[in-house]
């Protein structure tokens, strides 16, 4: 039923090191991180983050979580979220996309998540995902290359290329424009083109910006996803919808600072690509 993703033993072996073009599994890819020298990784996170306030997603049911239909966001101490997750209490608490670079962390703590690629590519995010049987709806990242690193527990990823399946998306002006409307977990996967991979502790998965993916954790799970700037944005020519989403996101984010916006290289790249796309379309037409 499921397609298989190619696997490697080292991130240095993948053929698209500087600009991801398809996902790859790196077995044991993140075991070089210092965090794996800790005997109790859960206690490590509790010790270093317990007093930090985190924006926590609150769900009443797993079905809500499968569609990333967040019922409430609560800013609360990590210690409170930690206790909810470890006991499997309801409502379900979930920390997702929490960038540790934005937290009040000692620089030495960040060293626990150093990845082999960090010396050759610009790492601009260290994202924490922490939950118990947590799920995430199918979505794309639109920009940057992502590497999902499974730190604790096990996680299953369902992933497919942008045009692989005729599924509905939210509108480009929606706050969920990078998500599918369909609950991927409740669809008949035998009728779809889907790659499936199970990540164990120490495994990594590379994710290009335009690949749809949904995740399901098995029991308590901690993932650290690292994001890397791309040197090429040409993929946007094949994905004009993503181009518009990025353009709108950047404009909304920097609307009050047009000068800064004009200096934003991704903004300039998108403008140039939009012009090229329109000219190419008119010429070919």
Task: List each language-model region with its residue ranges.
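N-terminal accessory scaffold of Fe(II)-dependent oxygenases
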Residues: 1-204, 214-278, 282
């Amino acid at each position: 039923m499921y397609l298989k993703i190619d696997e490697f033993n080292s991130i240095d072996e993948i053929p698209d090191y500087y600009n991801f073009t398809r996902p790859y599994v790196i077995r044991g890819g993140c075991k070089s991180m210092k965090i794996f020298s800790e005997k109790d990784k859960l206690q490590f996170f509790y010790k270093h983050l317990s007093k930090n306030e985190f924006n926590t997603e609150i769900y009443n049911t797993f079905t809500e979580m499968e569609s990333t239909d967040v019922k409430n966001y609560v800013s609360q101490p990590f210690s409170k979220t930690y206790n909810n997750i470890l006991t499997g209490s309801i409502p379900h608490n979930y920390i997702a996309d929490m960038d540790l670079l934005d937290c009040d962390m000692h620089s030495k703590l960040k060293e626990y998540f150093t990845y082999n690629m960090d010396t050759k590519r610009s790492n601009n995010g260290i994202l924490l995902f922490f939950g118990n049987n947590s799920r995430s709806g199918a979505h794309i990242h639109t920009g940057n290359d992502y590497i999902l690193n499974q730190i604790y527990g096990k996680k299953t990823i369902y992933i497919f290329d942008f045009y692989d399946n005729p599924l509905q998306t939210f509108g480009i002006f929606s706050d969920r424009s990078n998500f599918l409307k369909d609950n991927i977990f409740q669809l008949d996967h035998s009728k779809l083109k889907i790659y499936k991979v199970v990540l164990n502790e120490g495994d990594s998965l590379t994710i290009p910006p335009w690949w749809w993916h949904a995740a399901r954790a098995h029991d308590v799970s901690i993932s650290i996803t690292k994001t890397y700037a791309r040197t090429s944005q040409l993929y946007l020519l094949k994905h004009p919808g993503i181009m518009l989403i990025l353009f709108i996101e950047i404009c909304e984010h920097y609307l009050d600072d047009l000068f800064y916006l004009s200096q934003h290289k991704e903004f300039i790249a998108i403008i140039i690509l939009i012009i090229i796309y329109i000219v190419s379309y008119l010429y070919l037409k």
